[in-house]
Amino acid sequence: MNFSWLRRSPASSLPGLVAGLSLIILAVSVFAVIYSEGAGQGLTVDWAPVLSVLKMTFFQAGLSTLLSMTLGLTLAWSLSHQRVFPGRGFLVSLLSVSMVMPTLVAVLGLVSVFGRKGWLSQLADLFGGPGPGTFVYGLTGILLAHVFLNAPFVARALLQRLDRLPPDRLKLSASLGLSPWRQFCIVEWPAVKTSFYALSATVFLLCFTSFAIVLTLGGSPAFNTLEVAIYEAVKLEFDLARAVTLAMVQVLVCAGLVVLASSLRNDDGSLGVVSRVSLWPAPVGARVLQVVTIAIFALFYISPFLAVLWDGALADFGRLLHEAAFHKALVSSLCLATLSSALTVAMALAIGGTKRTLGSPLRVELNWGSRTLSSLLSFSGAIYLAVPSLVLGFGFFLIARKLTA
């Protein structure tokens, strides 16, 4: 490998290289510890239940991704055409909240709305109709929660792409008399296609590594995913051999998916930075579909927020504020969040700056060495999906177990 380009690379690139490669080394070390533990125990595990869990994990992740991407794309298309209505700005801003919302808060909100004693059940009792029953649990509950968290994220990202469509393209499609479907296929879909594929891979990985949602709403071992199965093997059964096997499968599958997702570029140089202005009204049928889509989604998305706020307003905050456990948890959360966010931002800026340097022919010589390091840095940015937090914690548990022994 030719490293001559390193002599021309700015010294400011070194922190990014150190940060990115450190993350990869950490992931490889965790995998090595898990593998060594498995090799020491012989990996004498019945593979039938492991394959069954893997099949269920792929199934729910694939179905969740399909539903999330379909709803997200439809909502983004609807919002891009319906530019003016009361609360549009608030709704678009609210779409970004799902990615920072704690998973358990989302689960509690969905249960408060769709649970056996939730708002929907009370509304059904009021009108004498059948309630949702256990709809929010099992596979339907898992899918519902995944769509609730991921569809807004998809819609927000795709809406930004649609808003950057040059007005000339829209003017040309209108002058040609294209139907809404033909306009979408010829003008709008090419603008969001690359983003759509990249987002699909990301959403699939998020659903594949889902833990809290499956644990709380799964309702049955039949719907266990790999992460939940690892948790049960360690926490409930202390079957380390099975946990090691599941963790190895999880890391290998996720790493392969991350490599595949990294190959999908999320860029399109043909788009401008102009704001889209809707000057040509769509046919009545298309407008009705857009309005109905926005209304149903707004009701589905906002009602769990309101349920959480309503339930929280009825809480005994006076007693909570005087509990020592609450004070300890609050201080711990603030300290961990502050330190983690500061370290994360610093490492992200360093990795991003180094990756930009490695991709610039004016700063480095573009050869196999620079491209390899650039690919490794891209992989390090998605390492949290390749080695999920539960698997990482399991690896640390094995390390601590060896040290204490």
Question: Over which residues does each language-model region extend?
Answer:
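A short amphipathic helical element positioned immediately N-terminal to and/or at the very start
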Residues: 2-6, 40-47, 185, 316-321
